[in-house]
Amino acid sequence: NVTPDKTKMIKKKYKKKIITALTISSQKDVYKYNKYKKISDIILFDGKGYENSIGFDHSLIINVPKNVKKMLAGNIKYNDNLEKFIKITDIIDLSGSLETNGNKDFKKINIFLKNLNKINVKNKKKNSIN
């Protein structure tokens, strides 16, 4: 747990971009981003457990303003409906779900990339119509 003041000091001292990770289990937890939004470059909303993340209701971050760069984690699977996450966040962290027994699983990675490519193609078609 790093306070906003400590975060500001670290950013100033090292002149690096900062990702602040918040553990989310309720709407009240989401609002903690307000303390960091002017300091951190990215706010990571994650479930409890980090590496062995417990999921949370990802829709809780819907009301976080678009000008806040959001990263979403929390038990997101490689074969989940990615479109629903893309609508509410800038970055999706699903690294752990791409592993089997602690090693990257190329089958899972390929499924994820195919699903992501379908979304990209769909969005390109949609944008070319508008």
Where are the language model's segments positioned?
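Glycine-rich phosphate-binding active-site loops on the catalytic face of alpha/beta enzymes
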Residues: N1-D5, G47-N52, I88-I109
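Catalytic beta/alpha-barrel core
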Residues: N1-K11, K16-K35, D41-I54, M71-G74
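Catalytic cores of alpha/beta
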Residues: D5-T7, S25-I39, I61, K66, ...
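C-terminal helical cap(s) of enzyme catalytic domains, especially alpha/beta-barrels
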Residues: M9-K13, S95-N130
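Alpha-helix-loop-beta-strand connector modules within alpha/beta enzyme cores
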Residues: I10-A21, H58-Y78, F112-K118
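Generic serine detector
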Residues: S25-S26, S40, S53, S59, ...
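Short C-terminal domain-edge/linker segments immediately following a structured domain
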Residues: K28, G49-S53, L72-K77, T100-K104, ...
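Conserved, mostly hydrophobic/aromatic
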Residues: I43, D57, I61, F85, ...
